[in-house]
Amino acid sequence: MSLAEEFKSRNFSIYGQWTGVICIILSFAIGLASVFSRFIVFGIISLVYSPLLLFIEVPFLLRICPTSSKFDAFIRRFTTNFMRAAIYAAMSGGLWISLVIDPSSLIAVAVFLAIAGLFYLLAALMKQEFTSSKTLGGQGVAQMIV
């Protein structure tokens, strides 16, 4: 299945996964920029989210990167739509708290994390099976890992 066909499939877990990829990039870039401002703690939190999301959204990385069995077990918890919606909601909530101090660019990461969480929640509520994008190492590769 090509990338265009994946998007036409109307499977919200595919939309959530690609929004998650955008979150990885935003989380790293904005987190790095925020480390050099007065949002140091939240910038570091955002930087930590980036590799965590990378391992969640690109399942092939668990196969090729040397990680501990505890970390692998933690990442494998997020193989269902409900669990992915939960982790995205928690991450988004963590960055929404940064607004208590002052509005910053971290809100962009929080918004995209919330959107990805909503896509996964919609997929779960519509009882769509979790489908990993073929481009990101899914469809066969993801099944070997889990």
Swiss-Prot record:
Glycans are attached at N11. InterPro entries: TVP18/Ca-channel_flower. The keyword NADP does not apply. GO terms for cellular component: Golgi membrane. One of its GO terms (biological process) is vesicle-mediated transport. It is found in: Golgi apparatus membrane. It is a multi-pass membrane protein. Keywords: Glycoprotein, Golgi apparatus, Membrane, Transmembrane, Transmembrane helix. The keyword Coiled coil does not apply. The chain crosses the membrane at residues 16-36, 39-59, 82-101, 106-125. Golgi membrane protein involved in vesicular trafficking. Belongs to the TVP18 family. This is Golgi apparatus membrane protein TVP18. It comes from Coccidioides immitis (strain RS) (Valley fever fungus).
